[in-house]
C-alpha cells in the first residue's frame, strides 16, 4: 500500500489517477498511523515552500516524514514535494525543509519564461531502479519556478533550462522528481511502475524479517 500524503497542497487527483492506472494499491491520507503502516510514501505538492512546511508542521507530519525518510521505506517527492525533501528554500523567505537530502532550493534566474512550464528533455545521470524501461533523453512535464542546488552525487536526471535543473534526485530510499511523472505520459507511468516495484521489494523484505 502506497500512502499519498494529503496536506492540502498536492496534485493529489492526478497522482491518484496515475497509481490507479498502473494498478498500485494506495491510500490518500494525512493520518500518521496510516502513513507508518504503508509500504511506500508519495509526497506531492504544488504551491509555496514556506506554506507547505507550515502545514506539515501543524499536522505533525514533518516528524513523520523525517522518520520515514531515515528508515528504508521508499519515499517519492514530486514537484514541491521533492523540494521539501531538501535542507532549506529561499522561496519568499529562508525556510527550513525536511533535511532528508543535502541542498538548497533556489529561484530560477534564466533568460526564459518563468515558471518553467511544459515538456523538456531529461538526460539520465547514472542508473537507478526508477530508470528501468526509461530511455535517456525522454521528455517529461515541468511546472516550477525554483530548482534544487544540490550535490552531483544525488542527481540522476538533468534538464536544461538556461541552468542545469536537477530533474530527478535520489539517495538510498529517497527519490525526488522535479517534474510531474503523473503528467508525463508513458514515460512517467513507467517511472511510477518502477517506484511501485521498489515499494513491493521493500515490503517483501519486511515480511522475511
UniProtKB/Swiss-Prot annotation:
Keywords: Amino-acid biosynthesis, Cytoplasm, Glutamine amidotransferase, Histidine biosynthesis, Hydrolase, Lyase
Primary localisation category: cytoplasm
Pfam short name (any one): GATase
Catalyzed reactions per annotation: 5-[(5-phospho-1-deoxy-D-ribulos-1-ylimino)methylamino]-1-(5-phospho-beta-D-ribosyl)imidazole-4-carboxamide + L-glutamine = D-erythro-1-(imidazol-4-yl)glycerol 3-phosphate + 5-amino-1-(5-phospho-beta-D-ribosyl)imidazole-4-carboxamide + L-glutamate + H(+); L-glutamine + H2O = L-glutamate + NH4(+)
Annotated InterPro entries: Class_I_gatase-like, GATASE, Imidazole-glycPsynth_HisH
Domain Glutamine amidotransferase type-1 span(s) in chain numbering: 1-205
Annotated EC: 4.3.2.10, 3.5.1.2
Annotated GO biological process: L-histidine biosynthetic process
GO cellular component, one term: cytoplasm
Domain of life: Bacteria
Pathway membership, UniProt: Amino-acid biosynthesis; L-histidine biosynthesis; L-histidine from 5-phospho-alpha-D-ribose 1-diphosphate: step 5/9
Active site: 79, 180, 182
Record localization: Cytoplasm
GO-annotated molecular function: glutaminase activity; imidazoleglycerol-phosphate synthase activity; lyase activity
Spans traversing the lipid bilayer: none
PROSITE patterns found in the cross-reference section: GATASE_TYPE_1 (PS51273)
Subunit structure, as described in the record: Heterodimer of HisH and HisF.
Function: IGPS catalyzes the conversion of PRFAR and glutamine to IGP, AICAR and glutamate. The HisH subunit catalyzes the hydrolysis of glutamine to glutamate and ammonia as part of the synthesis of IGP and AICAR. The resulting ammonia molecule is channeled to the active site of HisF.
Name by which UniProt lists this protein: Imidazole glycerol phosphate synthase subunit HisH
Amino acid at each position: 500500500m502506497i500512502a499519498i500524503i494529503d496536506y492540502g497542497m498536492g496534485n493529489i487527483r492526478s497522482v491518484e489517477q496515475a497509481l490507479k492506472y498502473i494498478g498500485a494499491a494506495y491510500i490518500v491520507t494525512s493520518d500518521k498511523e496510516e502513513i507508518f503502516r504503508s509500504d511506500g510514501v508519495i509526497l506531492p505538492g504544488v504551491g509555496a515552500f514556506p506554506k507547505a512546511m507550515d502545514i506539515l508542521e501543524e499536522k505533525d507530519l514533518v516528524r513523520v516524514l523525517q522518520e520515514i525518510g531515515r528508515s528504508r521505506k521508499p519515499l517519492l517527492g514530486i514537484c514541491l514535494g521533492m523540494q521539501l525533501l531538501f535542507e532549506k528554500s529561499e522561496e519568499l523567505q529562508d525556510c527550513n525543509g525536511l533535511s532528508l537530502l543535502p541542498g538548497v532550493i533556489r529561484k530560477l534566474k534564466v533568460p526564459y519564461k518563468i515558471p518553467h512550464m511544459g515538456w523538456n528533455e531529461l538526460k539520465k545521470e547514472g542508473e537507478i531502479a526508477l530508470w528501468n524501461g526509461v530511455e535517456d533523453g525522454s521528455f517529461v512535464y515541468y511546472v516550477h519556478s525554483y530548482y534544487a542546488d544540490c550535490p552531483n552525487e544525488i542527481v540522476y536526471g538533468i534538464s536544461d533550462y538556461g541552468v542545469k535543473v536537477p530533474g530527478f534526485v535520489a539517495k538510498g530510499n529517497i527519490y525526488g522528481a522535479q517534474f510531474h511523472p503523473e503528467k508525463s505520459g508513458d514515460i512517467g507511468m513507467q517511472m511510477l511502475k518502477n517506484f511501485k516495484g521498489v515499494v513491493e521489494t521493500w515490503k517483501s523484505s519486511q515480511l522475511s524479517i
